[in-house]
Curated annotation (Swiss-Prot):
One Pfam family linked to the record: Toxin_22
KW Signal (keyword) present: yes
Residues that span the membrane, as ranges: none
Family: Belongs to the neurotoxin 14 (magi-1) family. 01 (HNTX-16) subfamily.
Taxonomic classification: Eukaryota, Metazoa, Ecdysozoa, Arthropoda, Chelicerata
Protein name: U11-theraphotoxin-Hhn1b
InterPro entries (alphabetical): Toxin_22
Organism (species): Cyriopagopus hainanus
Disulfide bonds: 75-90, 82-95, 89-110
Length: 116
């Protein structure tokens, strides 16, 4: 009976000591994998950031190009008084004398172009 207890105790001590070694090994392995994962995530994050910056630069370039070429300067909307000599009516509008309403305020207003 004593031999069984001694054998059991010996096996138990070996299992615990080897289990601790495996636990330490596993901890070190997990730490290495975590560090590798962090470096991979940093690399992926930097790559994504570069792509986003390139895309943003392209979009800003297109916006600035568009604003220089095709954007209208401030214009006067429909039904707003305008100057006959310097009409700044928006595109599609013409500076004309009013027919009925507004004849007592100013002499010209921006109206939609009439097709003939």
């Amino acid at each position: 009976m004593n031999t069984v207890r001694v054998t059991f105790l010996l096996v138990f001590v070996l299992a615990v000591s080897l289990g601790q070694a495996d636990k330490d090994e596993n901890r070190m392995e997990m730490q290495e994998k975590t560090e590798q994962g962090k470096s991979y995530l940093d690399f992926a994050e930097n790559l994504l950031l570069q792509k986003l910056e390139e895309l943003e630069a392209k979009l800003l370039e297109e916006d600035s190009e568009e604003s220089r070429n095709s954007r209208q300067k401030r214009c006067i909307g429909e039904g707003v008084p305008c100057d006959e000599n310097d009409p700044r009516c928006c595109s599609g509008l013409v500076c004309l004398k009013p027919t009925l309403h507004g004849i007592w305020y100013k002499s010209y207003y921006c109206y939609k172009k009439r097709s003939a």
